[in-house]
Amino acid sequence: MNTVRVTFLLVFVLAVSLGQADKDENRMEMQEKTEQGKSYLDFAENLLLQKLEELVAKLLEEDSEESRNSRQKRCIGEGVPCDENDPRCCSGLVCLKPTLHGIWYKSYYCYKK
């Protein structure tokens, strides 16, 4: 009966000592995994940041295109039909009714002052 107790005690001591080693080993493995996880998170964060920067650049480009397209239209040159309510004749020109008789596509044209 004494040998059974000694054997049991020996097995118990070995199990506890090996269990502690496994616990320390598990702790180290967890630290390594969290460090790897942090590096993966950093990589994912950088990738997301790059995509967001590309998206912002694209949106800013679209805004600048809109501002270019929304500029005032170019002026109308001499002898070109114009609208009497909204004359867009160039400077030095006036939107007037033609002095010549005939059939005209538009009734007003840009002429020099």
Swiss-Prot record:
Domain of life: Eukaryota
Residue ranges of the propeptide: 22-74
Disulfide bonds: 75-90, 82-95, 89-110
Location of this chain's protein in the cell: Secreted
Record's keyword annotation contains Transport: no
The keyword Disulfide bond belongs to this UniProt entry's keyword annotation: yes
Alphabetic keyword roster: Disulfide bond, Ion channel impairing toxin, Knottin, Secreted, Signal, Toxin
Gene Ontology CC annotations of this record: extracellular region
InterPro entries reported for this sequence: Toxin_22
Coiled coil stretches, renumbered: none
Signal peptide: 1-21
Tissue expression summary: Expressed by the venom gland.
One Gene Ontology MF term: sodium channel inhibitor activity
Comment block on domains: The presence of a 'disulfide through disulfide knot' structurally defines this protein as a knottin.
Function: Probable ion channel inhibitor.
Entry's family note: Belongs to the neurotoxin 14 (magi-1) family. 01 (HNTX-16) subfamily.
Protein name: U11-theraphotoxin-Hhn1a
Origin species: Cyriopagopus hainanus
